[in-house]
Amino acid sequence: MKHCLLLITAILLAHVANAQKKFERETRIKSAKVAEKARTYVESLFPDSKKIKWYLEENLEGVTIEAKLKENRSIYSIEFDTLGTLHDIERTQKFDQLPMEVQGNVTAYLKKRYKSFKIKKIQIQWTGDPDVLHALIRKGDTDNTFTTNYEIVYTGREDKDTASYESLFDRHGKHIETKEIIERNLNHLLY
């Protein structure tokens, strides 16, 4: 009985530790391999875009399909499940473009948690009904029936250890979650 309890505890701890990690591997795919529902949605969102790139993304939670494109000097990422159901829409953002409240709360969180940090990438993330998000991106309609978060990728140093992290903050800059990014080990050189 004692050994069984120890085994269950070890499994639960491993699961909790795994939940705080992030690993992604993206593979470029042809648009013909993407669910028509996803292709149609992205094409209606960005009808003038000629360079939509599709990716199969494998992560610790499963597999998703992602469309990436550049529009009006921003990079958009639209994520779907393999059947074409929308997960979220993300757009790159500069730190000084964030609302002042968000800038202050994010900076306070990072300064409190790390001795030093460097922000690598910021994305504004929208989730909600696909039609509402379509109106938001195409027309700028904001009826606030969607969720806005900020996804921030950065390096942070704690004591002597430096690692890469991805944190999610709500629309006010309140911390939601942080995952340590698992770097991909390669047995060959990248040029």
Which positions does each model-derived feature cover?
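Long, charged/polar, surface-exposed segments that mediate recognition or autoinhibition
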Residues: 82-125
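Exposed beta-strand-loop-beta-strand "reactive/processing" segments of non-cytosolic proteins
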Residues: 47-79, 135-168
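Long, low-complexity acidic/proline-rich regions
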Residues: 128-132, 182, 186
